[in-house]
């Protein structure tokens, strides 16, 4: 089977306002029974002009300048082609990357997604922060690239490593979450003052429907999220939560 590891570099951290300026993808084959990565099949990396100046603070992180992206556009047909025969898109913090790429390339909305940040029990396996650079360092890698293709390759290497407690590749628990039902939770009518709390929880703002939402996997996660919303966001107010399978 084939999956794809995806990473983006963007103009900023607001998925409602910012734009993708670099899209990186690594397609790989794996054994679904063991979670073993077999081989890399294809690699994609292209830059795109966002149509406005990249903020200096963002350039300082990924070192992609206005001159590097000037006049460039990512090939939509090439993106669609590389997704052919791919079962799942994996991103480290998919809650950020997914809305950005779905907005730019609607083909991603029809794909199944997995998040290596939240769908792998890193803390239970003895790791601290689940940020990619920390996980890589804990596994003996020193990676400071902050470029899309390099981050994809680094994540794939991390997914191929065995978790210390399970003694299985990190890819395997990620695959297990895909067998659970996926739900999009909408925090309809959430109070304005809770926006930072929602964003920190992994919710993303949709300017089109003017609502915060996030994806969760499984009935347990769904129930937990609804309880959290009612207690922390609505806090005794009438709750306006919508769930979409």
Predicted regions mapped to residue ranges:
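Conserved non-catalytic scaffold segment of RNase H-like nuclease domains
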Residues: 1-111, 118, 125-145, 172, ...
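Residue-level "edge-of-site" marker
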Residues: 72, 149, 211
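Short secondary-structure capping/turn micro-motifs that flank functional sites
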Residues: 75, 152-153, 214
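Short Asp/Glu-rich motifs
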Residues: 78, 155, 217
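Active-site catalytic microenvironments for nucleophilic, acid-base chemistry
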Residues: 104, 138, 158-165
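Acidic, divalent-metal-coordinating active-site segment for phosphoryl/phosphodiester hydrolysis
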Residues: 150-158
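Acidic two-metal-ion nuclease catalytic site recognized across multiple nuclease folds
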Residues: 161-245
């Amino acid at each position: 089977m084939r999956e794809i590891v995806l990473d983006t570099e963007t103009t900023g951290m607001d998925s409602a306002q910012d734009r993708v300026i670099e899209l990186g993808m690594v397609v790989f084959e794996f054994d679904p029974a063991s979670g073993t990565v077999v081989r890399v099949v294809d690699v994609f990396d292209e830059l795109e002009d966002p149509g406005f100046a990249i903020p200096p603070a963002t350039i300082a992180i990924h070192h992609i300048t206005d001159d590097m992206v000037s006049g460039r556009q990512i090939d939509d047909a090439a993106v669609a082609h590389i997704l052919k025969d791919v079962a799942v898109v994996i991103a480290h913090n998919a809650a950020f990357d997914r809305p950005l790429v779905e907005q730019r390339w609607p083909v991603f909305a029809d794909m199944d997604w997995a998040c290596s940040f939240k769908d792998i029990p890193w803390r239970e396996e003895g790791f601290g922060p689940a940020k990619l650079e920390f996980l890589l360092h804990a596994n003996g890698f020193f990676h400071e690239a902050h470029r899309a293709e390099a981050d994809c390759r680094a994540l794939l290497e991390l997914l191929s490593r065995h978790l210390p407690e399970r003694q299985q590749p990190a890819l395997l628990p990620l695959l297990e979450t895909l067998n659970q039902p996926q739900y999009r939770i909408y925090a309809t009518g959430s109070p304005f003052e809770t926006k930072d709390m929602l964003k920190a929880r992994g919710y993303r703002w949709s300017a089109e429907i003017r609502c915060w939402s996030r994806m969760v996997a499984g009935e347990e996660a769904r129930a937990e999220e609804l309880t959290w919303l009612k207690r922390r966001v609505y806090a005794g107010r009438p709750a306006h939560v919508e769930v979409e399978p």
